[in-house]
């Protein structure tokens, strides 16, 4: 059967027990790093923003505050989603990560609204900015720190298939863009004071803040869409579904067909179920071993997969759903139907 490595949308290998523990430690470590870095940046931006009276720096402090809250939520989600399934949650706790991503997106929307409100207030009643150079410096440091931490979050988030970490990474990545925008706005004010002394350039600061808000609203919408998909039990990505079909189809002729393939995802966990059609003369024992073999194969390549297979006999009735996933050639189907008709005719009438 085809090897899924390198196929778009298909994880290379499943996570074994030892590797899962290492992955969990990695996830917790980078989540804690995000909390610590955001705490430091919030303090720095607040001090500088209040000192120089810059609404754009203050808006960035609020943005980093939201990032800090998101980082704490991500840390909670990472720890909770790793809990084993129990009687109350038989499918596990994976959706905690999806809920985390949705909440983080809503927090970004709220932060954007506050930034726009404050920026409009500053446009209508501008206030002088003192020591804009400090604002430029703190925005530069913020950008550098967030680039490093967000890259690490993206890396671990993709490797461990963590929705919460990737959502946290998007928070920090938007902070990079917004910090750069504020830095440019303050730098223009600094340069303008030297080149055009007396010119009114204070409007640049709130305009930069509004541009910041528009950028993070765009990121929030994308994050809401992505995290909401799994909450609504959307199917696995097309690449993964195509690979599952290819994997099962490769088992013909022992497998006559399959249908009613349904998939969904909760955090990093995948749930796959389908009806497997086999020869009607196959013993229950052999059919059971076949289903077990397919389950092991899918679990070996799809991370944290739970596979449910319903085995049914190929009796030649060829219902519409069965025909859709039939692996037999037309001639073979006719032979099965003929055999079924012969059996029916030979059966004693009641």
Residues covered by each model-derived region:
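Conserved beta-strand segments that form the floor/walls of ligand-binding pockets within enzyme
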Residues: 101, 139, 273, 277, ...
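Histidine-centered active-site/metal-ligand motif
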Residues: 63, 89, 93, 171, ...
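Solvent-exposed, non-transmembrane regulatory segments of membrane-associated proteins
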Residues: 282, 288-350
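Short edge beta-strands and adjacent turn/loop segments
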Residues: 254-277
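Alpha-helical transmembrane cores and adjacent cytosolic helix/loop segments
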Residues: 2-239, 243-246, 339-345
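A short interface-forming secondary-structure element
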Residues: 271-289
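Short flexible coil/turn linkers enriched for glycine and charged/polar residues
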Residues: 130, 266-270, 302-305
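Short secondary-structure junctions
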Residues: 249-258, 300-305
